[in-house]
Amino acid sequence: MGCESSLDPRVARLIDANLDRAREGLRVVEDWCRFGLERDDLVISLKDWRQRLGKLHQERYKRARSTVTDPGAGMEHPAQLDRHSPRQVVEANCGRVQEALRVLEEYGRNVDAPLSAEAAAIRYGLYDLEVTCLTATSGNNRRNRLQDCQLCLITSPCPDLVDRVKTALRSGVAMVQHRCKSGSDLERLAEARTLAALCRDHGALLIINDRIDLALAVDADGVHLGQDDLPTDVARGLIGPGRLLGRSTHSLNQVAEAHREDCDYLGLGPVNNTAVKPERPAIGAALVGEALAITHKPVFAIGGISQANLDALMAVGCRRVAVIGAIMGSDNPEKASQNLLSSLSRPTL
């Protein structure tokens, strides 16, 4: 009774307000983890934290509530209106909850020790969960963008590589796979950084071929691996869940295996004979059609693909291709990019 009567009503009001703030913010993040990420593990933690705070939301705090006399009620900051993506909403609400929990921890220390201790424990737990949630959100965003990609430009060494990529991006290409096979690591890093900046400026995905270290160094959207590169589980452990992982395939068995693994997309080919991989026999367009029937993951046909032979792939339902020479070797990379994109976006008859 002494604690009840000695509680400063102003402290009771701010504890009530911050309990509301923390629980509401946790619910905002929880719903994104539930509906946006479909991460049961995160939802369970967030729901548990909400309920633990709810049990500590005593009647004496609620009785002190006075929204009418609260000078901060209804106040907005311009930053609150500048949230245009789920990631920004999650970041803002995690920050909101962390601040509220710190207030509860500090003001509750002398009037409600259990609340203070619980607020501290949840705050530290949220620091880690926020990182996990934002990483998963980045991966979710990248995977959504991947679904919209129809044309992937694979680079090949040439004096005007950056200019050609820039032209392709301006023409609507939304995915670039950088093959960094020549030069020193310092030169490769510099080139990858330039391409990463270009892709960010144009809202395009940048995938680094083979080199996980370079992909991480330039904060690329993902990495593409061949059949003889690191196993998928090892690669995923290195790049984390927030980046894309592609795998080259050359047969239906390899497609089926990649489908079962934690890959985000597949490259399948060579569809036609190609100077890049002359030792590999062409698999033909028909096999691409068969592959599309056994996986829901995006499949990019690759290998000697050009405007001249694109119809054969489209006839079997293929709407995603990866090209090298068709753009990198074209006299007019802008027109080549636009023509390929126009053909790939034609409605199915």
Swiss-Prot record:
Gene label: thiE
Name of this protein: Thiamine-phosphate synthase
Primary role: Condenses 4-methyl-5-(beta-hydroxyethyl)thiazole monophosphate (THZ-P) and 2-methyl-4-amino-5-hydroxymethyl pyrimidine pyrophosphate (HMP-PP) to form thiamine monophosphate (TMP).
Swiss-Prot/TrEMBL GO biological process terms: thiamine biosynthetic process; thiamine diphosphate biosynthetic process
Thiamine-phosphate synthase as annotated region, ranges: 126-349
Family annotation (SUPFAM superfamilies): Thiamin phosphate synthase
Entry superkingdom: Bacteria
Region (Unknown): 1-125
Gene3D superfamilies: Aldolase class I
